[in-house]
Amino acid sequence: MARVIRKKPFVRRRPCQFCLKRQAVTYIDYKNEAELVRLVNMQGKILSSRITGTCARHQRAVALAIKRARYMAILPYIGLIKKDRDEIAQDQQKVEVKKMEESVKSAEPKATAEATEESKPKRTRKAKTE
């Protein structure tokens, strides 16, 4: 009986997150803890480029940045406690929310806020008739 050889399904490689940015990142800052935490697993090991999707050039830069951050005691050599990782993620979300609010405030003129308040009809209660 003939053996059936099955092909592995083609899985598209994730694009490098550093190459996708408008200005390609040439230096990955070791002081940027929030970004480096995403590239390290719970045991503190550097995630492979196959998992993170980084290209070879940026993977080498990521490894160097993580090693520098460990040496400078920004990242621990062993894994982060889940509580610490959650706090870092929350801090990062707060920063992103502040950036979004600032961009909305700068884009939105003050007059439009007043105009939207005037255009809304005021709600009144109807008197009950018995």
Swiss-Prot record:
Record keyword Electron transport present: no
UniProt keyword Ribosomal protein, yes or no: yes
GO cellular component, one term: cytosolic small ribosomal subunit
Biased composition (Basic and acidic residues): 98-108, 117-130
Gene Ontology terms describing biological process: translation
Coiled-coil segments on the chain, per record: none
UniProt region (Disordered), positions on chain: 98-130
Pfam families assigned to the protein according to its UniProt record, in alphabetical order: Ribosomal_S18
Keywords, alphabetical: Ribonucleoprotein, Ribosomal protein, RNA-binding, rRNA-binding
Gene3D superfamilies with a match to the protein in the record: Ribosomal protein S18
One Gene Ontology molecular-function label: small ribosomal subunit rRNA binding
Self-association state and partner proteins as the record states: Part of the 30S ribosomal subunit. Forms a tight heterodimer with protein bS6.
Task performed by this protein: Binds as a heterodimer with protein bS6 to the central domain of the 16S rRNA, where it helps stabilize the platform of the 30S subunit.
Family: Belongs to the bacterial ribosomal protein bS18 family.
Protein's name according to its UniProt entry: Small ribosomal subunit protein bS18
Organism: Metamycoplasma arthritidis (strain 158L3-1)
Name of the encoding gene: rpsR
